[in-house]
Amino acid sequence: MKMIDDVIIIGIDSGYGNIKTANCCFPASVSTYAKEPVFKENLLVFESKFYLIGEGHKEFLADKTRDLDYYVLALAAIARELNIRKMTCGKIRIAAGLPLTWVSGQRDEFRDYLLQNKAVDFSFRNVSYHVEIVGVDVFPQGFAAVADRLSDFRGVNMICDIGNGTMNIMFINDKKPVSGNMFTEKYGTHQCLLAVRENVMRAHHTAVDETIINRVFRFGTADIKEDYLKTITDTATDYVEGIFQRLREHEYNPELMRLYVLGGGSCLIRNFGVYEASRVTINDDICATAKGYEYLAYVNLLKNGGIV
């Protein structure tokens, strides 16, 4: 997080699989209870309701304002960032984002959603917090992660941000983003996970735990029998081939441009992709986009004379 005067800027990358801030990452899932649950390691209490953060699985919602989940997850993200600085209160400016082609249509609604309470009292992990939400900025995903290094993007560059639910594609040509050449595809890593489950069930007549699948995605292997591993890696390889097919449909040509891959799915490109390494850059910092949101909000405030 960054600070201007007494205002704390906290970047929150509200993904469909994980919530990321500049310093932490946790599952984007919430279970709600009317009474205090037995297990409460990641318990958040807000307006007399109990929320277990990281429990269950959050379904894909193109409209993140449809329920209260992403608001509660934002409170958890704020608490985790404040905890790093040993703080429990403060003025907060949220720097958030949406998929590239959804920003213009959903920005105002998402901003109002995160601003629904100016003063917020809640507790997380048995620590009480009092925060004042003084503003919300909403930026485009993908671009935010590279906004602080545009000078590195000479020539033609394709940016590919692979998240859990979506894949965002844009171009940066001679250090400038091309606003009319941006795309959002519902082809995130969750689609690969579903394909793995289906193929393992078809080939081996058994279910495979998501923990194993994610480990193979991240490291290319896991402590399982070879025939199961082959089914998973073959499926992941097919998924990555699908990514490159979609990139080519959007004019990707490795001979004429460089490719910059980021997001949680970047590990799949590294482990299962076939590409010319000298022309592809993989940024596997899962918090890069949240850091970018903070950077953009900070720069905007400085341009505005520090006025929040």
PLM ranges: what are they?
Residues M1-I159, K176-Q191, A203, T211-V308:
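Nucleotide/phosphate-binding catalytic cleft detector across ATP-hydrolyzing
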Residues I162-N168:
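Ser/Thr-glycine-rich phosphate-binding loops at phosphate-binding pockets of nucleotides
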Residues I169-D174:
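PRPP/pyrophosphate-binding module of the type I phosphoribosyltransferase fold
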Residues R197-A203:
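Acidic, metal/cofactor-coordinating or nucleic-acid-engaging core segments within structured domains
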